[in-house]
Amino acid sequence: MPSRLLVSLVLAGVLAPFAIFAARDAAYHFGPRKPGAAENLVHLTLGASQVLFIVGAFRANLAQELLGLVSIAVFGVIDEFFFHRDLPPAETDLHAKAHMFLFAFVAVALALNHLPPLLTSWPPSWSAS
């Protein structure tokens, strides 16, 4: 199993592009398009959900990661469905890149934190003998 230091360094590297595009997206909201109070509340909750997952990923806490992911899914759907229709192309591009890099971080975090124990105990105990 990789050391926690190595895992943390890899996670930080994979997180960096998401942080950059999320910051650019947030900055965009202070310029060309200013969201209303309801959208800002959804964004605040979505950001808190992302922080919950990210902290859980660095702690390798599966319960915290899953709670963060469920919250991201719920508030992400609300954000996209109700507030992100007919966005300017520049903002759509920022969202697409932020989503892609968040997905990459989620995949890497779950793989590094939870896949090695499954691989080292093959076959899994739940499989037929």
Language model region names:
Residues 9-29:
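N-terminal signal-anchor/start-transfer transmembrane helix
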Residues 26-48:
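Interfacial loop at the N-terminal end of multi-pass membrane proteins
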Residues 91-109, 128-129:
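Alpha-helical membrane-associated segments of multi-pass integral membrane proteins
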Residues 35-39, 88-97:
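Non-cytosolic membrane-interface motifs at loop->transmembrane helix junctions
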Residues 67-81, 98-107:
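Hydrophobic alpha-helical membrane segments
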Residues 42-55, 98-106:
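Core segments of transmembrane alpha-helices
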Residues 22-34, 77-89:
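C-terminal ends of transmembrane helices
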Residues 1-13, 51-67, 105-128:
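Helix-coil boundary and interhelical linker segments in multi-pass alpha-helical membrane proteins
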